[in-house]
UniProtKB/Swiss-Prot annotation:
Localization terms from the record: Endoplasmic reticulum membrane; Vacuole membrane
Protein's name according to its UniProt entry: Vacuolar amino acid transporter 3
Residue stretches of biased makeup (Polar residues): 15-28, 50-71
InterPro entries: AA_transpt_TM (IPR013057)
Disulfide linkage: none
Species in which this protein is naturally found: Schizosaccharomyces pombe (strain 972 / ATCC 24843)
Length: 656
């Protein structure tokens, strides 16, 4: 059999039935489909010429061949409209090229039409099929596309350019002639008009509806694309490939198999941010206010009343400056936190930033686990009849049983209920803490306090930095804003407000309880039923917040290790599940090791994990991207020096 094969089609007899199921009829249908399957750029297109008079197809199908190309899920090529048919010549040597397509063909659609075992089976060979040598080039093309996609999936997909709405493209008469074309056009036009009218009113959406927007901030942690759409169970086979060229979206022609309202596909169009200034302020407040507030009273004891108040204010100012440096760098160099570092300094800087994010998030999660274990231990001791104090390891193990199933959640929006409950409980705990601080000071006065503690003051610096850590959520909030240029002034107001909140809670609680203040200040509350309820609810709030802290670390590690999706390969998916469980076990072990000295552990996390992200990386990025005068360069060098010195000093004092 020659590689270049010509197939001639006889003219049909008048009494021949098209649906007879004969070999020639089926062969004609296959040639008809192949001749109208859009070939990708970079391929030598086979000569496919079909004439209505010479084909073995009925008249209505032949007429449709020259006017309306049949779409099998691929994005239409403009050359389809100009295809005219005469003879059919298929050169199998021209069906393969060294260049892998990246524009028009949808590999998922091609995969559905391939026979044999699953495409993800590494032991599968198309030569084992009947006539495998004839269609081997098709399987080889599919294999090269998959390999090219695996290489591209090695890096996080954090491209932030905006793509225009594909529903706004003009539709031709031939598109309208397709079955369901007029209805499809009507639905698109109506959806477009509704969206335009809603945008014209300018009314903001409901305040952080179901906390989906806040969760999407974690889905784009530090600007990285961490979502796992390719592994969602609601992703169907009509999903657009992740590596499709966005410019070709406008030429998409729906086929008969395409649903009118497609499901949430794997390719997400970047839509402009629509968050108002007020919503951005609330997102910022949620990003900064958390568990660190409850560690501040004990930290004030470590540093002293005056020293701690002044240091907390200075740390807030320095953190604010570094946040602004990162925002300015992002405006100059678009991309995620890691992408900016990779663009300016190369892949090693990108790796360092992502590694710091992973270490910091695992450290936060471990601190949260220790906090929850300590709080639950105190609650159980109060409510039990024997007042028995169980070991912390028991409550840490209970959290392990909770975190394992939650860590297997790949769609972060499914954690919206836990985020809502956690924020409500945290707010109740802070209000209750203020209430008892004021009551205690009014009835008992100021307790025994120290203005400066020269022995343990260095530990306070790490706790203060831990409290202000939220830099990785700045960039995704900026993406969601309708007016990103307003973020610097909004951030200034938010930093002033949370600095006042942190200083007031630390100062009032330390003044109220003095040297008897505990590591978790809510444990200083008087033993009562309502107090136990508040303590328990706050512990549950932090327990439900821990999966959100682990999600970015898990996603970044997965994207660095696995280059293949687990949607169609159960083996890959279970390997990812094992990795997630191992990360949870690592966080559990770290929390168990640091649970005996929780204040020391929190200070260590702030010193080792948070300082590089806040005080070292942003000045370095700003220095290379935006420092165009000696003042800015001096500021960047000063901030980097402060961060490096603080990291070395606090780490040394913590361990030695």
């Amino acid at each position: 059999m020659s590689n270049s094969q010509s197939i001639k089609i006889k003219k049909p007899r008048s009494n021949e039935n098209f649906a007879s199921g004969s070999y020639s009829s089926r062969r004609s249908q296959q040639i008809h489909r192949l001749s109208h399957s859009p070939m990708a750029e970079g391929f030598h297109k086979p000569k496919l010429n079909i004439s209505p008079s010479e084909s073995n197809l009925p008249n209505n199908v032949a007429e449709n061949t020259t006017d309306t190309p049949v779409n099998y899920g691929s994005i239409r090529d403009e050359n389809h409209n100009s295809r005219k048919g005469k003879d059919v010549t298929l050169n199998s040597d021209e069906a393969h090229s060294e260049n892998v397509p990246s524009t028009s063909e949808d590999p998922d659609v091609v995969r559905r039409h391939l026979g044999g075992q699953a495409a993800d089976d590494d032991n599968f060979s198309s030569l084992q099929l009947q006539g495998g040598d004839m269609h081997r080039q098709v399987y080889r093309w599919q294999q090269e596309v998959d390999q090219n996609k695996q290489i591209r999936r090695g890096r996080s997909r954090s491209f932030s350019a905006k793509v225009s709405d594909p529903n706004l493209h003009l539709r031709s008469v031939q598109d309208m002639k397709q079955a369901g074309g007029m209805r499809r056009d009507f639905l698109r036009n109506r959806a477009s008009s509704i969206s335009m009218s809603s945008n014209a009113h300018g009314n903001p959406n409901f305040l952080n509806r179901n906390f989906i927007e806040f969760l999407s901030v974690y889905g784009h942690f530090a600007g990285e694309e961490l979502s796992e759409e390719d592994e969602d169970e609601d992703t169907d086979d009509f999903a657009m490939p992740r590596d499709v060229n966005p410019s070709l979206i406008h030429s998409t022609v729906p086929s008969e198999q395409e649903p009118l309202i497609s499901r949430h596909g794997r390719y997400k169009l970047q839509t402009p941010g629509n968050a108002s200034n007020g919503k951005a302020v609330l997102l910022l407040l949620k990003s900064f206010v958390g568990t660190g507030v409850l560690f501040l009273p004990k930290a004030f004891k470590l540093g002293g009343l005056v020293f701690s108040s002044a240091t907390l204010l200075i740390v807030g100012v320095l953190s604010h400056i570094c946040f602004l440096l990162l925002i300015q760098t992002r405006m100059k160099v678009p991309g995620s936190f890691g992408d900016i570092g990779g663009t300016l300094y190369g892949p090693h800087m990108r790796f360092a930033i992502l590694a710091s994010i992973v270490v910091s998030q695992i450290g936060f999660s471990s601190a949260y686990i220790s906090f929850v274990a300590s709080t639950l231990q105190a609650c159980v001791k109060v409510i039990s009849t024997t007042h028995r104090e169980y070991h912390l390891a028991v409550f840490i193990f209970i959290q392990f049983l909770v975190f394992v199933p939650l860590s297997l959640v790949r769609k972060i929006s499914k954690l919206s209920a836990t985020a809502l409950i956690a924020d409500v409980f945290i707010l109740l705990g802070i209000l209750y803490l203020y209430f008892w601080d004021v009551i205690t000071l009014a009835t008992k006065g100021i307790a025994d306090v120290a203005m400066f503690n020269k022995t343990d003051f260095s530990l306070f610096i790490g706790v203060a930095i831990f409290t202000y850590e939220g830099i990785c959520l700045i960039l995704p909030i900026q993406e969601q804003m309708a007016k990103p240029k307003n973020l610097p002034k909004l951030l200034t107001g938010v930093m002033a407000a949370i600095s006042l909140l942190f200083i007031s809670i630390g100062l009032l609680s330390y003044a109220a309880f003095g040297s008897k203040v505990k590591t978790v200040v809510i444990l200083n509350m008087p033993e009562s039923t309502f107090t136990v309820i508040i303590q328990f609810l706050y512990a549950i709030a932090i327990l439900l917040s821990t999966p959100l802290q682990l999600f970015p670390a898990i996603a970044i590690i997965e994207q660095g290790i696995f280059t293949r999706s687990g949607k169609r390969n159960r083996k890959i998916k279970w390997r990812k599940n094992y990795l997630r469980v191992l990360i949870v076990i690592l966080a559990i072990l770290i929390s168990w090791a640091g649970s005996s000295r929780l204040d020391l552990f929190v200070s260590m996390v702030g010193s080792v994990c948070c300082i590089p992200l806040i005080y070292m990386y942003p000045p370095m990025l700003h220095y290379k991207a935006c420092a165009n005068n000696w003042i800015l360069r001096t500021l960047d060098i000063f901030m980097f020096t402060i961060g490096a010195f603080a990291m070395a000093f606090t780490t040394y004092m913590t361990f030695f």
